[in-house]
Amino acid sequence: MPTYNFAAGPATLPRPVLEQVQRELLDYQGSQVSILEISHRSPVFREIYQQAKERLLQLMGLSADEYTPLFLQGGGTLQFTMVPLNLARDHHRVAYADTGHWSARAIEEAKKLPDLTVDVVTEAGPDFAHIPAVPDLPADTYDYLHITTNNTIMGLAYQDLPQTAVLLVGDLSSNFLGQAYDFSSFDLIYAGAQKNLAPAGVTIVVVKNDYLTEDHGLPSMLNYPALAKKESALNTPPVFQIYFANLVLKWLKEQGGVQAMDELNRQKAGLVYDYLDQSKLFSNRVAPDSRSLTNIPFTTGKADLDQRFIKEAAAAGLVNLKGHRLVGGMRASLYNAMPLAGAVALRDFMHQFEQEI
């Protein structure tokens, strides 16, 4: 019986990549040492790092003449602070769209900075059923607009990016390279890798080169220009995670790239949503035009029945379906590495469970 891991993160990883890592773990490409042991200053790692940068930009349709990828530490959570420190320079006033828990966390952290005004310019409301429209923002008032493209807990996602006159910053942690956006619309993107790209421990930042030219005297580890100058190696970078991410980027290209993953993810999500929409037992409260492709929360409406479903699903090989503690119920995370067969198995088990109730 196959096992499908629906965890929200750390999440399922591509099987071919895991197998390659297993083969190379004790002796990386004839070097006689493990990838876990190589120096971050060695030619071996520098080649891995350059490959990862090039593959990432290629998958995103971006040019190295305009954007620089960074492979950092501290998770998306550190970016909640680094973004305003580096970008809120002209007006010291920033705009945020609040569409769920993680956007609220970003707002909370930005508000801790002195001499910075943080405006919540749009919010999803208490039911978190719709992605709200973003109002027109004057370029002479705000330094940037921050959005969270996908909220894992509530299951909301932007299908279309807001058009804005100010810089656009995106937290893409949970649908990074799994949903086809025009990445050139962003001035800065960040994403924790532990959902779609690698094990936890590396955070991707892709920033326009325009914002790497001036050093504002920030502490070095919080300073994008300083980190870019040292190619993400002001301190020892997470070598293994970058190596792993490089292999996943190669795998993504072999699958057909971001557009192909978007199409597959829509197919997977569609199977689950179509069942939920006709079910008399299960429900999902998010409006169809705001639904996440990668994180689908659902519930029976009864806590004891939810727990029974989670337990019986796990026994059937469908693991980590428990919803986030803030909302309860169930949640199916269908990241890039989740095969179509996993979504089919979940839909079929939901049908079986409902028939037996």
Swiss-Prot record:
GO cellular component labels: cytoplasm
Cofactor: binding comment: Binds 1 pyridoxal phosphate per subunit.
InterPro entries in UniProt: Aminotrans_V_dom, Aminotrans_V_PyrdxlP_BS, Pser_aminoTfrase, PyrdxlP-dep_Trfase, PyrdxlP-dep_Trfase_major, PyrdxlP-dep_Trfase_small
Reaction catalyzed: O-phospho-L-serine + 2-oxoglutarate = 3-phosphooxypyruvate + L-glutamate; 4-(phosphooxy)-L-threonine + 2-oxoglutarate = (R)-3-hydroxy-2-oxo-4-phosphooxybutanoate + L-glutamate
Name of one Pfam family that matches: Aminotran_5
EC number: 2.6.1.52
Keywords from the UniProt entry: Amino-acid biosynthesis, Aminotransferase, Cytoplasm, Pyridoxal phosphate, Serine biosynthesis, Transferase
Family the entry assigns: Belongs to the class-V pyridoxal-phosphate-dependent aminotransferase family. SerC subfamily.
Role description: Catalyzes the reversible conversion of 3-phosphohydroxypyruvate to phosphoserine and of 3-hydroxy-2-oxo-4-phosphonooxybutanoate to phosphohydroxythreonine.
Protein name per Swiss-Prot or TrEMBL: Phosphoserine aminotransferase
Species annotation: Limosilactobacillus fermentum (strain NBRC 3956 / LMG 18251) (Lactobacillus fermentum)
Lineage of the organism: Bacteria, Bacillati, Bacillota, Bacilli, Lactobacillales
Gene that produces this protein: serC
